[in-house]
Amino acid sequence: MNKKFVFGVFGALMMPMVMGSCSSSDEPQKGGEDDNESKGKFVFATTVQGSNATSYVLLTGESLDEGTLSPVNNGLLNDGATQWVFHKNYLYALTYNQGNAGTTRSYILGDDGEMKARGTEYRISRFSSYGAYDNDILTMATGESNDVVDGNGYHAMMLNVTYLDVVNETSTTNHATAEHPYLMENFLGNGEYVTLSGAEQSGSHLYCGAIPMGLSQYGAAYDNGKWIREGYEHLVHSEAGGSGAGSYKAGELVGTQYPDECWVAIYDNDDFLNPTLVKTDRISTPSGRFRSQYYQTIWAADNGDIYVFSPSYAKTMTDPLQKTKLNAGVCRIPAGSKQFDDYYCDIESQADGKSFMRCWPAGGNYFLMVMYDRPLSESGFAGTDLAIFDATSKKLTYVSGLPSDITSLGKTVFTRNGNVYIPVNVENGYPTIYKINPATAQASKGVVVEGASDITGFGFLEPVK
């Protein structure tokens, strides 16, 4: 079976705008699978940096393993995206603009082998994570509730979910009610609010990392500061400050008071109601992090077991009380279970004290890891190395055969015929897809996109009738 994975971050409020363009009829073919005898093609989202402007081009190709492509006088021009999401033979461009609505739309592969924009366009505000469930792409974010406000005027934090039905090209959102307010306050029983990182479907269940964010104004003020731990009072901000993703309000306690815990929310479906919460104290928070982005690190292996990875990003916190003492590692929830078993592996100790930025399934019980180039305790760490983690043997092996001048690694991976593929951007050359054999951790050079400066996403699509 061949899979496409797209991961990352964000939360969305979407308002569809019908644009007079191509038809949105249509049932998907074998979504997400690459049938060698199909009319499908590989699709590459590329960035082209000109002397005066930047352009974005969707290219199609026949192979990941060899050859060259060029965006010059070729492909479909588009507005670019923060994250390209391939799901069931549809390609969605999720665009995130801080503080303003971003525009996204979806694309299909036509019978003529050319990419086509579909007719509906969406406005997306802030989103912090996303995933997929059945026919829907899910975007999630935690934000202020308009309905639950305390006597100080502080708003409780709630979950906002948008459902993008890729087949019917519709967008719906969850609606808070008195019965179901979708509150994220005191989500774990310690007073802190959480955000969700990733959404991994296994069977009918949905697995999300529950990421404790600290105490909101609402949580910190609750019952005269009931949830502020003794000795942690200095962490409550006395005035507003910061900027961007690091901004905060007076009265907030930013960052968890419980950094040595890992929580997973397991939902029976995608309504995001009544989750089963499972905890382990062997690893820290189950999410990668880069600025305001939260990277999914909970993934299902081919046999349905759920592997929960933690990069221990809380080691970067400034206050010692908020630093985790736990190494980057992985635990497991067996297929069909709602509890962690005794599986555990310390990944950091196998990497000379280094952690990882993000990870994806690579087929079987293998996982591809984007490794940091130095420990999180040092400044300037960057995710420019790759490694394969074998969950069966609990062995981490760095990938060989990669170029030495890597500047960045792709946001998307693709598995096919026992190999995993990832875009690699280099300082002296064009972006290239590399093929990695998980069993040997050996990489080999694949298709090159000449004239581009970046491959921001790639996957496989079959024509939609």
Regions found by a protein language model. Name each.
Residues E37-Q49, H87-Q98, D134-D150, S204-M213, ...:
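Short beta-strand elements that form the blades of beta-propeller/WD-repeat-like
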Residues M1-F44:
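Bacterial Sec-dependent N-terminal signal peptides
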Residues L76-H87, E121-N135, M184-G198, P286-I298, ...:
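Repeated scaffold domains used in trafficking and secretory/extracellular systems
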Residues Q257-F340, G353:
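Beta-propeller domains
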Residues L59-G61, R105-I108, Y154-E169, Y222-L273, ...:
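Beta-propeller blade signature
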